[in-house]
Structure formats: structure tokens, C-alpha cells
């Protein structure tokens, strides 16, 4: 979910409130009044159903089509780009607009309507005869024309019975054909308690999420001071960013005591969310009835029995109850698969708000051709695993014991692989067949979406192919146990992998019985749908077998019957036949007809023969003519009973699905670790040593040779492919922790804050544009995120302390629709950080203060640094305001009490032959220059413009013009030292024959910087020192006579004394 400021259009707002008749002979639906007397019985039936769903699109089944009428037809035609026609007029002469879609291709049309934010209500024909004629693929006799006419006459004058069978919404769909790839439909319900104006009671809100496919309800209660509405909204947006709902339901804005949201809050939600917002009946949120609804759903007497903390959270109860009501309404049945309730708290997870998620490009890239972190990481083999990985990234853990469980499991997989690889290398076996991780992933790739199939079983909507996929998945998951056991992992051991093995079929007899039942019931390649039958296997049911045998083998049955009659009656010329008028008959020649048995009933006399029928033959005829219908009815009944039986084991199926998903994610993390040479992080401040009430528990990070996941993968696409397939053996060597370059030539860098060796809380990062400051900051945040997800990290080593949130202020964007400039947007993000950050937060601030006057920008940046120091959070602060570097060199400049809170670092860069060379290395000290003109040249700025810029910089730009403090000589010396350090690094990377030239160029560059700085100061003492330096630089000592040298010394001493 993305949070956006623009208002939501009313077209996406759906309502389930029912219309009521305006009078006994008319209906009000929306803004229209329909007089029932003007319409045919069929249209009256349609309008009566439509009145219950005024804002939804009603798909009304008529034969082979789903039809839409009136405004629904116009709306659907516009969205689907289909023909808008008409179904004549009513008796008053009003045109009835109509549009339709074929029922056999309806899924694709429904998916498009749902994606457009519409609610789709499906109305089906219930009569069996309405589903079309039964199939007849043989050349055997069919029902006579006279019988068809008689049957059709019996139905004449009646209206086909129809019922609403399901309501499809963006958050409650479970059919794969309706769900976009890699998308998880969810619904959130929001309940808010606003205290009275004279009350000191805190503001409260509960946000609950329902994942119908996973069968989970997740809820979190938020609170803020009674007058801090903006604070509560900020918290809500953070939770909504984590939930990423497909739709949101709220109670109608009625009585707050019942549970409703005021119009102001509703408007704010519409402006903030990019999903449909649906108003439901306020009683669905009724706080007095919520407890009973939850107890009924979860089968407990009291909410205390759930043991999840829900009993003390009335708003969480009401919002969860509203979701259960909504699920039952949309699915038109009970929802037994919702059997897990999770209560979340802010301290459970590392919090990353929506802005930070976007700035770090976790799930979606900023640019259309960009790459998100998820796209690089997500190479899971099962649909459940891919969804679980997203959830783990949205919910990075803070509890170190849970993190270490995941890390230990990954280490176990890698350790097993390493042992196996060494053993197989010694025996000269192929590497690709020795890896446990690869074997697991190959097996996982054959497992279908058990989670969603289980959900559809609970909703009685699973299709025959779903069941076959389930049986095949169970068989494959059994092999997972074998692979792990053969690698030395036992379900009796401690750890996450043994726990997961206990949820695999080997330890769940009920799951094994499910697979056997499906194998016995469903054919190997069943049809896609049950409507035409043909999915049950022979031998599953005797009665079904008899009916299908009768229909499919009618000639055999007749042949057996006539042969038996010949023997019994001694009539060798007896034959059996069929015609459309009389049906089945026995036929005897005239000469033998007089010997016909008594039970033969004469039916027809021909010139040379007589035709007879018997009661047995009539029974066979009746059974045959109805056999296909009876077989299809019996097959559907048996299939329904099969789903009912399977639904009694939903809990075991959900356990299996969850275990497979976790194994998939763990093997995915292990594959990434092998491919990219990631290392296991060390999570410090373990839970047992942590005092949660102690606010002095400060965060810390100590990362050695860290890399940026996405950039490294982009620079090395071969490895990126291997991450999703096989192990890259070149990366299985020992860790090269001493180097700053890897296969992809990505330059690795250290980052340490708050550690024993580096106690500083803020890194002030300077350096040129394009040098890698933003990449360095982002990679630090991503390493911290991955560690809290329980993954190995792209670094030689990483020690991560107790971090509660990650904030970022990176990049630039405006909000034209919301009336906010780029600078305003950046200030809002900065304000959020300064108001929400704690001493356990990690904060990334990039170029704060740009976009306004330099004096204002520098002042804002200076104040922000001081505020961040007061908070004590870990901060990476990138800036081009070199004046800020004095805060680290002169601690008294800052308002902090600690003299070692700030450390200057810079991105190394140097100039060679007039060209800027970016080394991408983080070095101690402040940068000597931002090299803005060099970057402008690289971007293609015309030479004339660059020369003009240089002249302006040298001749006109002075510190006095800017109205800010002057650079100190000490700062200048530091800058020169940094430049010399970068020069030394550069000399190592260029050819020997150019080293002397490069040194000369860099020395000239430093002198140029000194002269530029001379022009940028107006302090007399500093001017005199620069003048003295110029004189010394101009002197040639070898050309001076002793007298001239003596006079020069007195001259210099006189200048210094002044």
C-alpha cells in the first residue's frame, strides 16, 4: 500500500447498505426510482436483487452470459470496453441499457472490474436445467423431440430461480484467476474512539486486517494524547503501510457509541489511502456484540481463551468482529478458515513508515525502470513463500531470540551444504547435486498454492484441479522431510527447522489421509470446473459408477438384456432397438411373435415384425434418459461431501502451508547468502539482557565491508540469476573481508555508530555529488533491515544493536495535487523524524535544507543536527554545507553535552587530468570539495556555462555574500589533509607512469582550493596569512642573496607581528 495525499474518487467508494422500497410497487436504487409494474417478471426479479446491492455491479446470469442493466451496464461497458446495447424498453418507454460478458470467460472480466475498485455481485441460475443441456459425446440415442417439448412446456410461464452466490471485493477474493500476480488481497477495518472535548481520555484507534486466504485476523490498537490527533494519524499511517490493504471498511458515520467514524476522519482516510473505502452498517462494529461474534468464530467461551490480549482491547474486538461479518456477507457462508487471531504491538517490529519504505525502494522502485529490494530478494519457489517473504520484510522483528531462530536455521542449511560440498568435492561428484538448499528449492518448486487452496476448501469453492494440486503438494512436502532428515536434521531436535518438520506430513497423519482420499476420489487430470462433471475417479462410489456405466455402456446393457431374454424365452431372433417416438423396444419376426412371453407388451405392429416393451426395458430406458443428469447430480453431491470432509482438516492444512512457506523463505535466504557471500549478523543487546524500562538502552551498529544489495546485484547480473536458481560456486570461497571490492566491483565500506570503538551517534558525510553518499546511507539501512528479518547480510561482519525504527529523508519530490512544494514535502518528512525518533532509531538524512535560501538551509540543517544529537539516535547525515563539519572539530559548536557525538567522514574523490574520479570509499574527515562543477561537466553542461560558473565562483562568491560564518583555518587544514589522503588512495589505482602527473595535478587542485578559499573570506588575520602564504610560494630560495634572505626574514616577522 502506498499513502498518497490526493483525494479518493467517489467511484471507488462502495456501500453495502440496502435500498428500501419507495412504495409497494416501486424500488429506489441509488438516485433512480423503478416502477415494478412497468417491467417484466424477469426484470422485477433483477431489480429486487439489485436493490440489496445498490453500489455494486450485479452480474445477472442469463443462459451463457452474465448480463448487467441500467447504470451497471454503462459503468461496466466503460471499464471493460465492451459494447453497450439495450434490452428494449419498459412499458413506460424507458430504454433498458444492457451489457454482458460470456460466463465461460467471466473470470477475466471480473478481475478487471475488481482492479478498477468495483464490488462485483454474482447472481447465478439455480435450476439444473438452466445450466445448459448435459453433454452427449457418444452416438447413443438421445431424448426424443416430443419429450423435450413436454419438458419445456412444464417450465413455461415460470421465472428461473436465481440467487446471489458470492460478492467479490478487492480484499476478499481467493480465486487465483482474479488475483494479480504476487498480490495478497486483504481487508482492514478501522474503529476510532474520539473522547468528548472536556475529557482527558486518550485518543484510540484499532486497525485490524483480515487475510481470508491465510485464515488470519491481525489487529493493533493505537493511542495518543487527547489533543494529539496528528500523532494518532501518523501512527495509523505507519500501521496501514505495514498492512498494505486492498480495501478498507469503516462503520457508517452514525452513533459513536455504537462504532462509527466521523466525516472528517472519513475524508482523511479517502485522501490517505489508495484502496476502496467501504462503509458498512454501524452495527457490524457494535462494541457490545463484538465479543460474542469473536467467541463464536473461534469456538471459545470467553475471549481470555484466545490468550492473545484481545480481551482488554474493545476497539480491536469491534474491528475484528466487523471483518468477520464482512467475510460472511461477501462469501455467503460461514468462514471456518479464519481460525487465527494475532494481536500486534508497536514494540514487536522494527518500524519503517511509508515514506521510508518508498525512499529505500523496498517494494516498489521510485522510477519506472528502477529495481526494488523485493525484486532482488524474492526468489522463493512457492506462492506461500513469496507472500511470507513480503510479510517478513514488512514486519522485521525486534525480539532477538526470534531473529536468532531464523539465523540459526539458515546457518544450519549452509553448514549442511558446506559439509556436503566438501564431501562431494573429495569424491569428484557434481556440485549442483550436493546442495541441500538446491534440492529443497527444486522440491518446493513442485508445490502449489496450498494456502489458497485450503481457503477455497473452507469456502466450498475449491475446483477439482485445486484438489489434485493439493494432493501432489502433500506428496512433494513429504520429500522435504526426507531431504532434511538425510542431512542430519531431526524433528526431535531444538530449533526452527525441527519445529517446521513437525508440521510436515510425516508428523501429521491427517494430512496423509487427505492426500490418499483425494488420490482415490479425483482423476489424474480433472476438468477445470465441476459444472460439466467428469472429475470423480472410477471406484470411488458404487452408485455413481452404475450411473456412468449405464450411460456410457448402454449398448452393452441392452445386448446383455436381449441375450438373457433369448435364452430364457427360446427366441433366437429377438432383437433390441430404439427410435425417437417409442424409445427402446424388443422386436420379433411375425412367425415368432406369437411365442412372445406374457410379460412382453405389444407396442407396435409392422408388416413383417412386432415390437414389444417390458417393464425392465422401460426402467432401463428411463434410467438411461436420466442417467447423465443423475450422474452429474450424484457427482456434484459427492464432490460437495468431499470438500466438507476436507474442510474438517483445515487446521492441519494451514499448518502444512505455513511450514512449507517458512522452509521456502529460509532456503531463499540461504541461497542469497551463498550467491552473494553474505555473513551472519550478530544481534547484540539480547532479550534476556535487555531492560525494557530502561530508556538508556541505546542502539548501535558496527558494519564491516557493507554492500548495497540492489546495486551489487545490478552490477553482477550473473549472480542475480544464480540467486534464483543454482549456487554460484565462485562465491562459496572464504570471506574476503580484507578487500573493498567483490566480483561485481562494488566498493564495500564500514559503518560504525554507538559501538565501544566508535561511540559517536552521528556521522556527518560530505563529498561530491555522485560519490555514493546516498548509496552508503541506504545500504546501512538495508543491512539493518535484513538482519531484523532474520537474514544473513551483505557484509564481512555486522553487529546490530537494539534499533526500534528506521527513518529516511532521502530524495526529492513535490506534491502538486496537495499544494506542497518539494521543500515543503522535505520539511514535513524532517518534522516527522524529529518528532518521532528515539535514541534507538536509525535516521538517514540527505541534504536537509536544500531548496531554499542558503542561509536558511544551513540554519535548518545546523538545528536539525543539534536536535538529532539531543535525541541520541543513530544518524547518517549527508550534506554539502561544509560549515557543519566544524561541529565535529569543535564540539562546543553543538548543543550536545557529549564531546564525541559527531564524526566527520567523506566520500573519496580526486581530480586526474581535469576529470573527476569517484573512488566511492568512505574516509575519515571532511571532504575538500563537492566538485559540483565537475559533476556538471559530466552531465553535459556546455563549456561556456561551466567557464562562466568558474569565473563567478572565483570572482564574486564570498562568504560575506552568503551571510554565514567563515571557514576556520583548522577546517581548511582538515580539508587539505582529506584531499591528500584521497590522493594517496588514487595513486594506488592509477598506472605507475601517471602517478607523478596525478600527484602534480592534485597538488595544483589543493592550491587552487586554498586560493578559492582566500577569495571566500574577509577576516583580516586570515587574509594576511593567505597573503603571507602567497609570498612564500612565489619565492625562489636558490636565487636569493644572503642580504635578500636576511631582509625577507625581517619582512615576514613584521607581517606576523601585525
Swiss-Prot record:
SUPFAM superfamilies: DNA repair protein MutS, domain I, DNA repair protein MutS, domain II, DNA repair protein MutS, domain III, P-loop containing nucleoside triphosphate hydrolases
Listed Polar residues bias regions: 130-142
GO term, biological process aspect, one: mismatch repair
Family recorded in the similarity comment: Belongs to the DNA mismatch repair MutS family.
Organism of provenance: Psychrobacter arcticus (strain DSM 17307 / VKM B-2377 / 273-4)
Gene Ontology cellular component terms for the protein in this record: cytosol
Gene3D superfamilies cross-referenced by the UniProt entry: 1.10.1420.10, 6.10.140.430, DNA repair protein MutS, domain I (3.40.1170.10), MutS, connector domain (3.30.420.110), P-loop containing nucleotide triphosphate hydrolases (3.40.50.300)
Ranges of biased composition (kind: Low complexity): 720-740
Role summary: This protein is involved in the repair of mismatches in DNA. It is possible that it carries out the mismatch recognition step. This protein has a weak ATPase activity.
Keyword Phosphoprotein set for record: no
Region (Disordered): 130-156, 720-742, 975-999
GO molecular function, one term: mismatched DNA binding
Binding positions for ATP per the UniProt entry: 767-774
Keyword Chaperone: no
Domain of life: Bacteria
Biased composition (Basic and acidic residues): 980-999
Residue ranges of coiled coil: none
Full protein name: DNA mismatch repair protein MutS
SMART domains for the chain: MUTSac (SM00534), MUTSd (SM00533)
PROSITE patterns linked: DNA_MISMATCH_REPAIR_2
Keywords: ATP-binding, DNA damage, DNA repair, DNA-binding, Nucleotide-binding
Amino acid at each position: 500500500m502506498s499513502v498518497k495525499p490526493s483525494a479518493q474518487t467517489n467511484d471507488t467508494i462502495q456501500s453495502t447498505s440496502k435500498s428500501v422500497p419507495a412504495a409497494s410497487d416501486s424500488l429506489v436504487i441509488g438516485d433512480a426510482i423503478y416502477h415494478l409494474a412497468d417491467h417484466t417478471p424477469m426484470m422485477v426479479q433483477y431489480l429486487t436483487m439489485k436493490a440489496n446491492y445498490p453500489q455494486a455491479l450485479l452480474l445477472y446470469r442469463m443462459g451463457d452470459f452474465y448480463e448487467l442493466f441500467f447504470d451497471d451496464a454503462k459503468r461496466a461497458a466503460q471499464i471493460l470496453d465492451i459494447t453497450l446495447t439495450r434490452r428494449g424498453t419498459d412499458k413506460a418507454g424507458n430504454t433498458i441499457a444492457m451489457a454482458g460478458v460470456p460466463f465461460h470467460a467471466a473470470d477475466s472480466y471480473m478481475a478487471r472490474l475488481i482492479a478498477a475498485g468495483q464490488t462485483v455481485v454474482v447472481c447465478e441460475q439455480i435450476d439444473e436445467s438452466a445450466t445448459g443441456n448435459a453433454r452427449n459425446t457418444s452416438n447413443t440415442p438421445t431424448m426424443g423431440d416430443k419429450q423435450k417439448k413436454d419438458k419445456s412446456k412444464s417450465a413455461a410461464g415460470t421465472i428461473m430461480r436465481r440467487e446471489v452466490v458470492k460478492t467479490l471485493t478487492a480484499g476478499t477474493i481467493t480465486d487465483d484467476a482474479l488475483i494479480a500476480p504476487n498480490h495478497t488481497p486483504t481487508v482492514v477495518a478501522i474503529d476510532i474512539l474520539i473522547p468528548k472535548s472536556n475529557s482527558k481520555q486518550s485518543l484510540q484507534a484499532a486497525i485490524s486486517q483480515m487475510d481470508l486466504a491465510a485464515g488470519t485476523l491481525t489487529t493493533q490498537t493505537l493511542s495518543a494524547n487527547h489533543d494529539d490527533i496528528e500523532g494518532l494519524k501518523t501512527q495509523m499511517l505507519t500501521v496501514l503501510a505495514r498492512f498494505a490493504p486492498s480495501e478498507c471498511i469503516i462503520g457508517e458515520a452514525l452513533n459513536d457509541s455504537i462504532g462509527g467514524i466521523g466525516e472528517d476522519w472519513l475524508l482523511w482516510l479517502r485522501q490517505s489511502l489508495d484502496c476502496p473505502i467501504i462503509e458498512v452498517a454501524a452495527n457490524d462494529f457494535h462494541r457490545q456484540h463484538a465479543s460474542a461474534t469473536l467467541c463464536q468464530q473461534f469456538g471459545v467461551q470467553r475471549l481470555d481463551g484466545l490468550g492473545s490480549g484481545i480481551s482488554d482491547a474493545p476497539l480491536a474486538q469491534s474491528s475484528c468482529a466487523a471483518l468477520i461479518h464482512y467475510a460472511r456477507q461477501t462469501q455467503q457462508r460461514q468462514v471456518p478458515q479464519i481460525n487465527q487471531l494475532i494481536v500486534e504491538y508497536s514494540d514487536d517490529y522494527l518500524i519503517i513508515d511509508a515514506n521510508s519504505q518508498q525512499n529505500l525502494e523496498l517494494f516498489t522502485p521510485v522510477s519506472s525502470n528502477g529495481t526494488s529490494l523485493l525484486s532482488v530478494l524474492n526468489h522463493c519457489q512457492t506462492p506461500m513463500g513469496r507472500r511470507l517473504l513480503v510479510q517478513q520484510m514488512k514486519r522485521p522483528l525486534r525480539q532477538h531470540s526470534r531473529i536468532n531462530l531464523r539465523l540459526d536455521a539458515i546457518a544450519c542449511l549452509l553448514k549442511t551444504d558446506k559439509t556436503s560440498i566438501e564431501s562431494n568435492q573429495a569424491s569428484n561428484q557434481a556440485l549442483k547435486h550436493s546442495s541441500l538448499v538446491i534440492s529443497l528449492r527444486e522440491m518446493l518448486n513442485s508445490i502449489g498454492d496450498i494456502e489458497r487452496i485450503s481457503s477455497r476448501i473452507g469456502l466450498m469453492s475449491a475446483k477439482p484441479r485445486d484438489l489434485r494440486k493439493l494432493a501432489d503438494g502433500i506428496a512433494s512436502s513429504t520429500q522435504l522431510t526426507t531431504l532434511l532428515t538425510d542431512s542430519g536434521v531431526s524433528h526431535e531436535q531444538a530449533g526452527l527447522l525441527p519445529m517446521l518438520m513437525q508440521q510436515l506430513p510425516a508428523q501429521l497423519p491427517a494430512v496423509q489421509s487427505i492426500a490418499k482420499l483425494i488420490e482415490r476420489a479425483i482423476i489424474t487430470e480433472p476438468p477445470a470446473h465441476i459444472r460439466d462433471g467428469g472429475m470423480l475417479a472410477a471406484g470411488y462410489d458404487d452408485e455413481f459408477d452404475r450411473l456412468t456405466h449405464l450411460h456410457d455402456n448402454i449398448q452393452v446393457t441392452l445386448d446383455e438384456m436381449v441375450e438373457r431374454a433369448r435364452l430364457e424365452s427360446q427366441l433366437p431372433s429377438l432383437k433390441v432397438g430404439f427410435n425417437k417416438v417409442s424409445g427402446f423396444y424388443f422386436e420379433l419376426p411375425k412367425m415368432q411373435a406369437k411365442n412372445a412371453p406374457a410379460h412382453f407388451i405389444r407396442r407396435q405392429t409392422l408388416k413383417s415384425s412386432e415390437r414389444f416393451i417390458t417393464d425392465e426395458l422401460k426402467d432401463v430406458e428411463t434410467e438411461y434418459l436420466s442417467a447423465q443428469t443423475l450422474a452429474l447430480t450424484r457427482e456434484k453431491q459427492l464432490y460437495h461431501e468431499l470438500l466438507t470432509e476436507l474442510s474438517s482438516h483445515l487446521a492441519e492444512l494451514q499448518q502444512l502451508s505455513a511450514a512449507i512457506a517458512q522452509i521456502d523463505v529460509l532456503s531463499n535466504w540461504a541461497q542469497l547468502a551463498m550467491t552473494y557471500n553474505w555473513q551472519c549478523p550478530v544481534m547484540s543487546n539480547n532479550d534476556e539482557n535487555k531492560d525494557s524500562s530502561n530508556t538508556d538502552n541505546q542502539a548501535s551498529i558496527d558494519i564491516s565491508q557493507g554492500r548495497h544489495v540492489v546495486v551489487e546485484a545490478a552490477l553482477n547480473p550473473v549472480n542475480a540469476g544464480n540467486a534464483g536458481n543454482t549456487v554460484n560456486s565462485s562465491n562459496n570461497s572464504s570471506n574476503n573481508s580484507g578487500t573493498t571490492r567483490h566480483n561485481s566491483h562494488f566498493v564495500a565500506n564500514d559503518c560504525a555508530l554507538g559501538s565501544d570503538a566508535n561511540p559517536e551517534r552521528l556521522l556527518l558525510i560530505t563529498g561530491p555529488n555522485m560519490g555514493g553518499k546516498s548509496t552508503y546511507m541506504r545500504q546501512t539501512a538495508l543491512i539493518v533491515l535484513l538482519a531484523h528479518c532474520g537474514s544473513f547480510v551483505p557484509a564481512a561482519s555486522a553487529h546490530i544493536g537494539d534499533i526500534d525504527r528506521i527513518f529516511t529523508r532521502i530524495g526529492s519530490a513535490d506534491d502538486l495535487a496537495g499544494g506542497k512544494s518539494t521543500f515543503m514535502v522535505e520539511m514535513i518528512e524532517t518534522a516527522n523524524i524529529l518528532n518521532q525518533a528515539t535514541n534507538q532509531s536509525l535516521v538517514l538524512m540527505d541534504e536537509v535544507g536544500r531548496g531554499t535560501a542558503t542561509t536558511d538551509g544551513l540554519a535548518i540543517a545546523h538545528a536539525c543536527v543539534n536536535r538529532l544529537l539531543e535525541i541520541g539516535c543513530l544518524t547518517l547525515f549527508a550534506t554539502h554545507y561544509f560549515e557543519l563539519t566544524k561541529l565535529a572539530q569543535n564540539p562546543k559548536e553543538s548543543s550536545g553535552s557529549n564531546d564525541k557525538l559527531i564524526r566527520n567522514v567523506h566520500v573519496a574523490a580526486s581530480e586526474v587530468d581535469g576529470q573527476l574520479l569517484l573512488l566511492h570509499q568512505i574516509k575519515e574527515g571532511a571532504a575538500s570539495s563537492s566538485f559540483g562543477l565537475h559533476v556538471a561537466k559530466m552531465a553535459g553542461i556546455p563549456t561556456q556555462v561551466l567557464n562562466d560558473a568558474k569565473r563567478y565562483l572565483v570572482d564574486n562568491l564570498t562568504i560575506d555574500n552568503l551571510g554565514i560564518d567563515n571557514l576556520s583555518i583548522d577546517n581548511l587544514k582538515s580539508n587539505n589533509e582529506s584531499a591528500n589522503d584521497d590522493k594517496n588512495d588514487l595513486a594506488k589505482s592509477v598506472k605507475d607512469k601517471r602517478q607523478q602527473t596525478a600527484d602534480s595535478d592534485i597538488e595544483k587542485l589543493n592550491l587552487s582550493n586554498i586560493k578559492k578559499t582566500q577569495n571566500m573570506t574577509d577576516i583580516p588575520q586570515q587574509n594576511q596569512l593567505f597573503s603571507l602564504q602567497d609570498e612564500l610560494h612565489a619565492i625562489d630560495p636558490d636565487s636569493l642573496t644572503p642580504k635578500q634572505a636576511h631582509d625577507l626574514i625581517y619582512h615576514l616577522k613584521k607581517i606576523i607581528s601585525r
